[in-house]
Every structure is written in C-alpha cells, then in structure tokens.
C-alpha cells in the first residue's frame, strides 16, 4: 500500500460545505465535472499510471463509514494522473463486486482514466462529497460517493501539487 493510499484511508474527512477554502482551491475540490477533462484543459496531455488493481476483502473503518451498505469484496484501483511526468493526482477507487457484475468493463480500463467512463454514464449521481487537508504534507484531497443506477462506488483523489490550484477551472 502506498503512502498516498494510507493518507487517504487515515484522513479526517469533512463535508465539503464545512470547509472554508480559497476559491482557487475549492473550485478544483468541488468540481462536479470530470477532473481528468479539467486537468487536460489546464495542463495539456494527461497520462494514467496504474499503481495497483486488486480485490480487497475488508475496508478500514474510515471507508466503511463513508461507503454505506457495501459488502466486500471491492475492486480497488489506484492510479496516478501525470502531465509531462509531473504527478498531479493520486486516485483510489473502490468498486463493489455488485457494480462490476453490471459493468465488467471497469476492470479493463488499463491506462484510461475512470472519469472517461464515469462521465459517460447518464445515471451517474454524486451522492456525497467530502474534503480533507493533510497538515503534515499540506496536500488536499476529496472523496465522492458516486451512484451508478442503484450501485455505488467511492472515488478518492489526492491533489499532489499546489500548481493545480494556480490554474483556473473552466
């Protein structure tokens, strides 16, 4: 497990409405459109580097509280989004087996961004959005509970460089 993954799993999360952030940061963290698309507009080409993909059978308490009524196993996918070899985002996605039975293509994404698939789903709804700011690293992160039909997935994203927040969200 990477340090980034541990940081996301052990973070103190709060509802997005409870955090007072500068507009330059909140506009990225509260983005309701595709983060990948926004990164491409801000940085040009964005590449996905898959760090790990595997089944997990237990969630830590933090993820269990956020992820209602989801039984493991979950497909866990961890990636880094890069532009010009600069790491921009670490993402950890948890997809329950029940969602994969309907959308097995999620296990075949390879170096494609999840957002390319997710934002093509007409029945996609973001149920929850939580944010965190890690004082030790000064990194910001967000996690969302996304519904696809009657099923949920969790997407957590750690913003790896403050350079992101200097770019205007379009």
UniProtKB/Swiss-Prot annotation:
Stored SUPFAM superfamilies: Chorismate lyase-like (SSF64288)
Top-level taxon in the UniProt lineage: Bacteria
Cell compartment(s), UniProt: Cytoplasm
Pfam families with a match to the protein in the record: Chor_lyase (PF04345)
Example of a GO cellular component annotation carried by this entry: cytosol
GO terms assigned for molecular function: chorismate lyase activity
The entry's keywords: Cytoplasm, Lyase, Pyruvate, Ubiquinone biosynthesis
GO biological process: pyruvate biosynthetic process; ubiquinone biosynthetic process
Residues that coordinate or bind substrate: 77, 114, 157
The enzyme's E.C. designation: 4.1.3.40
Top enzyme category: lyase
Catalytic activity: chorismate = 4-hydroxybenzoate + pyruvate
Residue stretches spanning the membrane: none
Segment forming the signal sequence: none
Pathway: Cofactor biosynthesis; ubiquinone biosynthesis
Known function: Removes the pyruvyl group from chorismate, with concomitant aromatization of the ring, to provide 4-hydroxybenzoate (4HB) for the ubiquinone pathway.
Entry similarity comment: Belongs to the UbiC family.
Protein name: Probable chorismate pyruvate-lyase
